[in-house]
Amino acid sequence: CRQRRHQPDGVFPKNMFSLDVGIDLGTSSPLVYIKGMGIILAEPSVVAIQASTKKPLAVGSEAKRMLGRTPGSIVAIRPMKDGVIADFEVTQKMLEYFIKKARSLARTLPWSKIRVVVSVPSGITEVEKRAVVESAEQAGADKTFLIDEPMAAAIGAGLPVTEPGGSMIIDIGGGTTEVAVISLGGIVVCISERTAGDKMDEAIVQHIKRKYNLLIGERTAEAIKIKIGSADELSEEKRMEIKGRDLVAGLPRTVTITSEEIRA
């Protein structure tokens, strides 16, 4: 990655007639922040649409509950993949939902300008960056700024990013893992790998299928990762009871798994 400079103490220029919104457009769980109000929305990156018209029916938590349960006429999809836009049109609909929500909560003047800063993986291409900007602006943003995710994560973690000493940040998201060294307000070096939390969930699904002949969904896999997953050995190993569909009998079945096998 090339070295880039940011203005961490003031991403937006001061303007009293604007609504300043920050969006972490994550692969699995976007966050929406309003200046002066804090985080106002944290929902899954899922949109339920009418298959024939692509008309959005639900966004976020409501749409995620439809995953795997929708009739053929309704499709619940993730418009982001590996940290970048996989479906431009649906991402735009999701951003429209975020921006409308921000405007309604902030109760801004009708003519107030909406300025949005979006965090993006440091390794994406100029074409992918342009897709993010165009999606945000077509969704209603008057001005869109981009910031690299490692820099945004470092600022959020309170690291001294403007000082001459180096600070390392490891940001594991749903679609990308990024490791960066930051100094003097810029990213000195970074590595972006499109392997992260979603790949872990997929690995858990495959493990349960191979070992127990049991099919589980992505929500169950994510719950396993969060509840009993670990990188190092635990002083006391954990156990968890899960339910799935037996691949032979086709009936629901319950098994107990351990943190040790998930870690392995």
Positions of predicted regions on the chain:
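Nucleotide/phosphate-binding catalytic cleft detector across ATP-hydrolyzing
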Residues: 1-172, 180-264
